[in-house]
Amino acid sequence: VASGTTTGLQSNNAALLAMLTSTANVLDNTELTDQLTWAFNSGSEHFDYLAVSESLVLTYTITATDSQFATDTQTVVITINGTNDVPVITVDAGDSVGDTLAVTGGALNTSGTLSVEDLDRSDVVAATITAFSKSGDSIGLTRNDAQLMAMLSVNSLVIDSAHEQGTLSWNFDSAGYAFGYLAATESLTLVYNITVTDTQGTTDTRDVTIVITGENSAPVISIEPGDSAAESIVESNTTLGAQGTLSVRDINTTDTVTATVTSVSPSGTTLGLPSNNPTLLNMLSVNTNVIDNVSETGTIYW
């Protein structure tokens, strides 16, 4: 007879009964007394489902029968006390411990799972993100460690008190941040420590690693307040001059941006124009170095 904590017990009564064996022939016809020997062997049943403070009581009845079918009985009681089994995180088929994401110009998202087991059936297992670290190219990164850590989330409840296995689901969401500062060949590695804790306070930890790889972002010329891309000049039989600025942005922080005048297209009244295209091209000059490798914005002076 099994009593105590039986929820989670894998063996049926027949299997439990077979775990106790006793001497078949105790007395022969020349003896009045002898010893009956019994032995308990659980075989492949480890009773790991028992948690701390839980126990299983197996009560066996041993019957001695003589040649005249007279009997006597004695109970043998086996008490199995539970101990704490630690939760264990594993990477099973379909699970993943991270992902590599390429910068796309928009928010970055990915998700995955890890498998968790705690053999103590009545224990509850919860998951939290307990630590974070980063490495790689971070010049130009405009998010602090707390904001980067908040980009990964996990489900809190992994295993309830009625199961031994559960799934830890993790989700990475950059919350609109594009990591556009990363240029081609650059990358940022984010490492999240995920810890599962059972009812007894024992833990297991696994890292989830997100690698973000950069891409080349083209520089963009714009006309901001105070800039100008045209000028009207009245000819006055002397050298003519004008100047202005254009704004430039390249979100790849480590890129350098230079400016050159590449073409000219005369239009309007060109009949009688003595200057050829190379001469006209040389009339407009710009600063060569627009953005250094530590900034995202710069100015073209023409």
Model segments located where?
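Extracellular ectodomain surface segments
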Residues: 1-18, 88-149, 220-280
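Acidic, turn/loop-rich segments in luminal/extracellular domains of secretory-pathway
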Residues: 11-80, 138-212, 236-237, 270-302
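Short loop/beta submotifs within extracellular cysteine-rich repeat domains
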Residues: 46-49, 70-72, 85-88, 98, ...
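Exported/extracytosolic protein signature
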Residues: 66, 79, 86-89, 104, ...
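Interdomain boundary/hinge segments at the C-termini of tandem beta-sandwich modules
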Residues: 78-84, 116, 210-216, 248
